[in-house]
């Protein structure tokens, strides 16, 4: 299926892994039962130009993915998970995140979202970062919350290195 998608002209795939959380499986179990299937799909997608790996959940085992064949890495930057800059430093790959995911996004105030987004933009300083939700954003959230994200994007100015 992955190869057929690329044959049809897609630039890449979004691939989510849901079995890499501390306490869910051991490293040995992951290597034996999960990684071979991940590699099969990511190898088929390797000729794509924009493959994103999303590591679902909390307490992720980030080290297990350092050499996965994906161009971009996405995960929830919640307590217990690596920060955007930590993951980028660990893997050298661009990261996707910085907007709270569901259900938190819909439960936050616009000011809290602005603060969170500003902090993530500042953390990465406009480098190796695509601003996106930690997971997804539920449909039907208050438009003011989406506008809070937009305001921070327009207000952001990277510092000179």
PLM-predicted stretches and their roles:
Residues 1-161:
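Active-site loop segments of alpha/beta catalytic cores
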């Amino acid at each position: 299926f992955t190869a057929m998608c690329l044959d049809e002209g897609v630039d890449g795939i979004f691939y989510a892994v849901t079995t890499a959380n501390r306490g869910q499986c051991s490293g040995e179990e992951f290597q034996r039962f999960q990684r071979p299937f991940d590699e099969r799909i990511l190898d088929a997608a390797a000729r794509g130009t924009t493959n994103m790996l999303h590591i679902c959940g909390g307490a992720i085992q980030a080290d297990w993915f350092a050499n996965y064949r994906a161009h971009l890495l996405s995960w929830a930057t919640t307590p217990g998970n690596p920060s955007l800059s930590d993951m980028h430093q660990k893997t050298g790959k661009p990261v996707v995140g910085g907007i709270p995911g569901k259900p938190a996004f819909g439960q936050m105030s616009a000011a809290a979202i602005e603060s969170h987004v500003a902090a993530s933009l500042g953390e990465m300083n406009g480098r190796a970062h695509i601003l996106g939700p930690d997971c997804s954003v539920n449909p039907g959230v208050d438009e003011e919350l989406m506008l809070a994200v937009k305001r921070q994007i327009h207000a952001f100015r990277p510092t000179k290195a």
